[in-house]
Each structure stands twice: as structure tokens, then as C-alpha cells.
Design a protein with these regions (language model features):
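Active-site-proximal loop/hinge segments within enzyme catalytic domains
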Residues: 1-91
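An anion-binding loop in the catalytic cleft
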Residues: 52-147
Length: 147
């Protein structure tokens, strides 16, 4: 992620220098936007990062996780407590074992049942606390995740 950011910054700097030079030399040709080709994206707010495991697919959740890195971040609510997700990965184990309980502690993290599959939360953050690994959550918040 940092490498990509650095590459984009260096490309922007080069293009900005060329664009400023062209503006000063009056070499830019202005083209009016065709509003029929324009698209609209709704405003991203804090609620955009909220997920509901029972209604969203694993793919949708991974896409939101990638899209909302940094801000607003991804979070879910359990027992009326918002919990931020800081690490996710695919689950390769027995998906049938999660039918009765939406959350299950496994070696890699916390396995969570989604609308179509299962994913694993590897790092999370409780309100006002630091980011912890799922294994730390097992030790300190095991009862919290019981249904």
C-alpha cells in the first residue's frame, strides 16, 4: 500500500509540473464535461463502514474492507458495541461448524459466518482501546462473543 502511494505521488508531481507549465504557456485546451458520461458516487460517511454479517456476502465485506482502509474503516456491532476490524482473511476450514454460532475462535482468529460463507477477523479494536490480535481477544473477551 505504501509503495503504491509513493508511486502515485511521484506520478502526480510529474504531471503537475507539466500541467502548470502548460497553463503558464496557455497551451491547455479546455474541454467541457459531457454530463451524460458523468457518474455520481454517494458521500462516504462513518456509517458506510458498518457491516452486517448476516446480510452481506464475504466478497462484499472484503471489498468494503479494501475500500474503507483508514477512514471510515470497517466495523460491526455486537451487544450494542461497535468493533472496528483491522485485519481480515479467507476461511479455509469447515463452514458447517459455524451454523449455530456466528462467531467462533479458531487458531487464525475469529471465524465469522457471513450471508454466504465464512471469513476470519485477525485484528480488531474495541472502542477507546488499542488494536489487538484475535488471539488476544480470545483471552480477554471470549464471553463477549458468545451468543
Amino acid at each position: 500500500r505504501v509503495d503504491l502511494e509513493n508511486k502515485l505521488v511521484s506520478l502526480c508531481i510529474k504531471n503537475l509540473q507539466n500541467d502548470l507549465r502548460n497553463i503558464l504557456n496557455s497551451k491547455l485546451i479546455l474541454i467541457e464535461q459531457n454530463n451524460n458520461d458523468a457518474s455520481y458516487c454517494s458521500k462516504i460517511d462513518k456509517l458506510s463502514g458498518k457491516i452486517d454479517f448476516t446480510k452481506e456476502s464475504t466478497r462484499e465485506i472484503f471489498q468494503k474492507f479494501k475500500a474503507f482502509v483508514g477512514w471510515p474503516g470497517l466495523y460491526f456491532e455486537k451487544n450494542n458495541t461497535p468493533i472496528k476490524i483491522h485485519g481480515l482473511k479467507e476461511y479455509n476450514g469447515n463452514k458447517e461448524a459455524l451454523k449455530e454460532n456466528n462467531f467462533r475462535f479458531i487458531e487464525e482468529g475469529i471465524a465469522v459466518k457471513t450471508s454466504d460463507s465464512v471469513l476470519v477477523i485477525t485484528h480488531l479494536q474495541f472502542p477507546g482501546r488499542r488494536i489487538i490480535s484475535a488471539s488476544d481477544a480470545v483471552n480477554s473477551h471470549a464471553k463477549f462473543f458468545e451468543n
